């Protein structure tokens, strides 16, 4: 096993934009797997024409790297949802150290928040939940049924390999990448 797993804290770096090279610290806790540099680079290359001035929602923020990377690449705003207290507190600390103000961090159960909160739809939504908990399907259903998505919204899904995925008929697959361990999909809402 990788020795970094046993360290109390780890860090990843923002790979592009006005925060390029800045670090994001995170606690090594079960189920926290920040999206790798390679996958993030691919994802944000896919989104490069659409990220500027977008409103982003990071449904299971964890390290917050997806929402923060979006801000670094000139997204207008990111909402980060995280339930785990230590991870949430680390996220708050990172946002303060990065001196960014167009990020909202909410300590909440993502499914509960999507069900109960009223907000306007997001342009880009990141879904990268803990594995083996059936959260992708539940999140997709809430995003669609509670009108969190609008025409031309992008929805990024990262999940363990060999898990099936069923999306609404009005979502069109825009890009996909499959590695040894994960599968990544970027959909666009057509209606």
From Swiss-Prot:
Catalytic activity: guanosine(966) in 16S rRNA + S-adenosyl-L-methionine = N(2)-methylguanosine(966) in 16S rRNA + S-adenosyl-L-homocysteine + H(+)
Class in the EC hierarchy, top level: transferase
E.C. number: 2.1.1.171
Any one GO MF annotation of this record: 16S rRNA (guanine(966)-N(2))-methyltransferase activity
InterPro entries membership: DNA_methylase_N6_adenine_CS (IPR002052), RNA_MeTrfase_RsmD (IPR004398), SAM-dependent_MTases_sf (IPR029063)
Keywords tagged on the record: Methyltransferase, rRNA processing, S-adenosyl-L-methionine, Transferase
Database matches in Pfam families: Cons_hypoth95 (PF03602)
PROSITE patterns with a match to the protein in the record: N6_MTASE
Disulfide bond sites: none
UniProt function note: Specifically methylates the guanine in position 966 of 16S rRNA in the assembled 30S particle.
Family classification: Belongs to the methyltransferase superfamily. RsmD family.
NCBIfam families to which the protein is assigned, alphabetical: 16S rRNA (guanine(966)-N(2))-methyltransferase RsmD (TIGR00095)
Name of this protein: Ribosomal RNA small subunit methyltransferase D
Native source organism of the sequence: Buchnera aphidicola subsp. Acyrthosiphon pisum (strain APS)
């Amino acid at each position: 096993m990788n020795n970094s797993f046993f360290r109390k804290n780890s860090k990843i770096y923002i790979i592009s934009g006005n925060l390029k090279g800045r670090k994001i610290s995170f606690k090594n806790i079960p189920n926290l797997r920040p999206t790798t540099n390679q996958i993030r680079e691919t994802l944000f290359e896919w989104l490069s024409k659409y990220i500027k001035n977008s409103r982003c929602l990071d449904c299971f923020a964890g390290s917050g790297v997806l929402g923060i990377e979006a801000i670094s690449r000139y997204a207008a705003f990111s909402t980060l949802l995280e339930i785990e207290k230590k991870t949430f507190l680390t996220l708050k600390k990172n946002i303060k150290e990065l001196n960014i103000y167009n990020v909202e961090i909410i300590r909440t159960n993502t499914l509960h928040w999507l069900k109960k909160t009223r907000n306007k739809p997001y342009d880009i939504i990141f879904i990268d939940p803990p594995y083996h908990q059936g959260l992708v399907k539940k999140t997709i259903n809430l995003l669609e049924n509670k009108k969190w998505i609008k025409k031309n919204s992008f929805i990024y899904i990262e999940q363990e390999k060999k898990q099936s995925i069923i999306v609404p008929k009005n979502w069109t697959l825009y890009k996909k990448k499959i590695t040894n361990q994960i599968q990544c999909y970027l959909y666009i809402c057509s209606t």
